[in-house]
Design a protein with these regions (language model features):
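Generic, well-ordered alpha-helical scaffold segments in large soluble proteins
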Residues: 42-47, 99, 103, 138, ...
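Conserved helix-loop functional segments at active or binding sites
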Residues: 160-164, 197-200, 204, 235, ...
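Glycine-rich anion/phosphate-binding loop at the beta-strand->alpha-helix junction
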Residues: 194, 246-335
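Active-site-adjacent "gating/activation" loops or surface patches in catalytic cores
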Residues: 226-247, 251
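A helix-coil-helix interface module used to build multimeric assemblies
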Residues: 2-217, 221-232, 294, 307, ...
Length: 455
């Protein structure tokens, strides 16, 4: 069967392929091979620039330009050649080494030092740095920019609706009012914390040999400070150096990375569900799009499908990334191979994330606040003013203020007239009484507006 969007196994590359395109060049097999080629070439260039390694002369500009061109112009044809070699070697990293040795034959200067390609390296030296570069690239070029788009959209809602009052609900029951914008601001603040945590997450790498002790390195060049050499190389790639590892970099940072993404996603799930609920309560209307159908049998339906789509895909994303975070830091003794197949799925969870983020933004774009309904609902719940009234009563020493308001309001609908009459009978200063009399459920919003403006 010919491969197409209709025949792919995963909906990430099928139905939703346009949503996750930005990750393909990073986490695909092609992307992994390109990063491996990059690391191998940078390692050879580092060796050549080291005077103590006399067997590899300092490379000429022509040789360095040639190597850099292999990285910059790495093509699908190059990747296919590596896969062709792998069919013989049955070893993916060795296939990259042999590919580069083939390439080096075009330049005698490089052919002469081709045995220093992959010098003293274990496969995991190349792999861990490649995976780190993949995650770093994805974070900086895709994930954080996508997060910023969501934060900006929800911030826009916060500012646009900062003055529109909303009947809060705790335990599903009417509670002290807020504003629509303030509820959006709460989400923005939470998301910004996770943004900062992912942004600051260390992305670690190592290049220290088969068990992390530079055994092979020291056997060939015992007078080189390989510990320092390793640090210089890893940091030259823009990564943080991990000096203590077994054969593998232990992947703790990957768990931290995905944990931050999972937390961000969990906040978005909470947001999706709240918006779904607000739509159900008629707090928000959804703008209709010409030609769209909400139900195959009920023509009137306008469903909150975007928030539902987002919630579902974030659940899938979190399931994958939670497994990665729990599995990858565990490896038997100096290493086992269980991480290898799991690491090939680094981009899967993030792919579901991109689908979800696009859906949430689409859902937001359709929202239109139903201000009149919100005000009507507040006007039907004057009992929420029991809180400020009993608090003022406490201030002026009135006996059992809470109990008196409880008797008046608990489990009851109290209208404006009953609340005004209760206030009028209070033995409190006239100016305080007048202030309470002016209060309505729609104006009892505390510092909600100011809090949005301080965001």
């Amino acid at each position: 069967m010919q491969l197409s969007a209709l025949t792919t196994l995963s909906p990430i590359d099928g139905r939703y392929q346009d949503k996750a395109t930005a990750l393909r060049g990073i986490f695909s097999e092609f992307g992994l091979l390109k990063f491996r080629v990059t690391v191998e070439i940078r390692w050879l260039q580092k060796l050549a620039a080291t005077a103590e390694i006399q067997e590899v002369s300092s490379l000429s500009k022509e040789a360095n330009d040639y190597l850099n061109k292999i990285v910059e112009e790495f093509s699908l044809q190059d990747a296919e050649r590596i896969k062709e070699i792998e069919r013989t070697t049955n070893h993916d990293v060795k296939a990259v080494e042999y590919f580069l040795k083939e390439k080096s034959e075009a330049l005698p200067e490089l052919a002469k030092v081709s045995e220093f390609i992959h010098f003293a390296c274990t496969s995991e030296d190349i792999n861990n740095l490649s995976h780190a570069l993949m995650l770093k690239t994805a974070r900086e070029e895709v994930i954080l920019p996508e997060w910023q788009k969501l934060i900006d959209e929800i911030t826009r809602l916060a500012n646009e609706y900062k003055t529109i009052p909303l009947l809060s609900r705790t335990h599903g029951q009417p509670a002290s009012p807020s504003t629509v914008g303030k509820e959006m601001a709460n989400v923005v603040y939470r998301l910004k914390r996770q943004f900062k945590q992912l942004q600051q997450n260390e992305i670690l790498g190592k290049i220290n040999g088969a068990v992390g002790n530079y055994n092979a390195h020291l056997s060939a060049y015992p007078n080189i400070n390989w510990h320092k050499f390793s640090e210089e190389f890893v940091t030259s790639l823009g990564l943080d150096w991990n000096p203590y590892t077994t054969q593998i970099e232990p992947h703790d940072y990957i768990a931290e990375y995905f944990d931050a993404v999972v937390r961000f996603n969990t906040i978005i799930i909470d947001f999706d569900r709240d918006l779904w609920g607000y739509i159900a309560l008629n707090h928000f209307k959804q703008r209709t799009i010409a030609g769209e159908i909400g139900s195959s049998t009920m023509p009137h339906k306008v469903n909150p499908i975007d928030f539902e789509n987002s919630e579902g895909n974030l659940g899938l994303a979190n399931a994958v990334m939670t497994h990665l975070g729990q599995k990858l830091p565990i490896s038997r003794w100096q290493r086992d191979l269980t991480d290898s197949t799991v690491l090939r799925n680094l981009g899967v969870g993030l792919g579901y994330c991109l689908i979800a983020y696009a859906a949430t933004r689409k859902g937001i774009s359709k929202l239109e606040v139903n201000e009149q309904h919100l005000r009507d609902e507040l006007n039907q719940n004057w009992e929420v003013l029991a809180e400020p009234i009993q608090t003022v009563m406490r201030r002026y020493g009135i006996e059992k203020p809470y109990e008196k308001l409880k008797e008046l309001t608990r489990g009851k609908r109290v209208d404006e007239k009953a609340m005004r009459e209760f206030i009028e009978k209070l033995a409190i200063p006239a100016d305080e009484k007048a202030r309470l009399q002016q209060l309505t459920p729609a104006t009892y919003i505390g510092a909600a507006i100011e809090l949005v403006e301080k965001l």
